[in-house]
Amino acid sequence: MGVGFDDLTRENAIDLCKRLIDEHRSAYMVTPNPEIVMAAWENAELHDAICNADLVIPDGIGVVKAARIIGTPLKERLPGIEIGEAILEYAAQTGKSVFLLGAKPGVADAAKEKMQETYPGLNVCGTNDGYFKDDGPVVEKINAAQPDFLMVCLGAPKQELWMAQNAERLDVGLMAGLGGSLDVFAGTVMRAPKAWQRMNACLLY
């Protein structure tokens, strides 16, 4: 497929995320679906950003099926938002801090409120919408907060490129490119019901 994925179970992936958070070395995780993989074929910078990530997990049943066809099967599909939920739960339990980056103005703040209702004790140490032109002030704002976990929800390929370009400038534990997750957490976009998710039919919902 031109992109190497980490072959992990959900439990293994979450454990690795926890370790990367604890190491606090500005690691980053990407969650490519088939569309992102195809875009990486034509975009060398995106390809490098994905391949240089500390963790590459398959978010999309198409990736899992393609891997099986070419003889490099993956253990399971790992939706990025579900990994994000597990990390938020871990953060709430351990006092780790979280910064929310992305979406339209107001969405990250709404997501913060919902997250803190769902995960009591969660420390959301900062938010910033995704409508910025200059990375510098945003990087400074994030570094001032020193989050353990940075949710980067800028959409692909912007979020993958942003993490790769800024990893060395950031003082965070783990960054994760999680697409439209903030909209889901804020309640402005609904996920497909669990039954649809189990059938891998989310795109039809």
Regions found by a protein language model. Give the residues of each.
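Conserved small/polar residues in nucleotide/adenosyl-binding loops
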Residues: Y205
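N-terminal nucleotide/polyanion-binding subdomain common to many enzyme families
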Residues: M1-R77, I81
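Portal/gating segments that form or line small-molecule/metal binding sites
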Residues: D48-K114, T118, C125
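Short hydrophobic/charged patches on amphipathic alpha-helices used for structural packing
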Residues: K18, H47, L88, V139-E140
